[in-house]
Amino acid sequence: MPLLQSHLAVVTGAGSGIGRAIALGYAREGARVVALDINAEGAAEAAREINAEGGAAQHFALDVTDREACRAIAAKIESIGPVSILLNGAGIIRRNAFTADPDAVFKDWQDILAVNLNGTFNVTQAFLPSLRATKGRIVNIGSLQSFLHMRTPSSPAYTVSKHGVLGFTRALAAELGKDGVRVNAIGPGLIETPLNAQMRASKPENVQMFLEHTPLGRTGKPEDIVGPAIFLASDLSAYVTGTIVMVDGGYSTV
């Protein structure tokens, strides 16, 4: 039997990259999927691909920084069925160092934290009643930078946001365990997604720096995140909560 049969999974950031790959992976394991993304067409494409494969998916546009919009979409999805899996995958990245133009750095700080950290909070809070009712599973997308700041140029706001996602994951796991809700995170390394396509093309030396520090010697693909995401959303991880599964080719071990 598919690992996620009978589950209704909500995936934010489903319009591209890691979120899209996970949405497809969840559907292939039997879950009904609601694909959410600020890019309405991206979310629609993910849902169309799932439905074309014989799965069941719906899609909606969502700006995760809008708390009221998150609550409204949760109410709408409640009519589809109780949500038992929430994958918080919406995220952005900027690469201004702290010593760059002060106004640009401040805007990065506001924008990145609004999406990566506050967005995770907003969506989780909106779906929490349903997740408590179903004794559901929350999977947050963290990062290598949930633990460290990359040696390659990166915004400190991104590092702070992903540290925050890990802290939020652990705090919720401690609080919601009594309700039967499990909360975990995934820590991707350098995964080939649209978010970093420009950096990979224009700064090959940054990619090489990552590879030299990575035992497996390659960058990751969005599909590399799917297995861990299914594991954390399924009964295979029934006694796992408050942890982060690193999917970084071994970068964080050396």
Name what the model sees in each region.
Residues 2-34:
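Canonical Rossmann dinucleotide-binding motif of NAD(H)/NADP(H)-dependent dehydrogenases/reductases
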Residues 135, 177, 182, 240-242:
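Short, small/polar-rich loop/turn modules that mediate ligand/substrate recognition or access, typified
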Residues 129, 174-178, 238:
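Alpha-helical segment proximal to the catalytic Tyr-Lys
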Residues 229-230, 241-254:
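Short C-terminal tail/terminal secondary-structure segment
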Residues 93-110, 151-157, 197, 201-202:
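Conserved mid-core segment of classical short-chain dehydrogenase/reductases
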Residues 139-164, 169-178, 191:
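Catalytic loop of short-chain dehydrogenase/reductase
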Residues 40-41, 61-72, 224:
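The beta1-alpha1 cofactor-binding region of Rossmann-like NAD(H)/NADP(H)-dependent oxidoreductases
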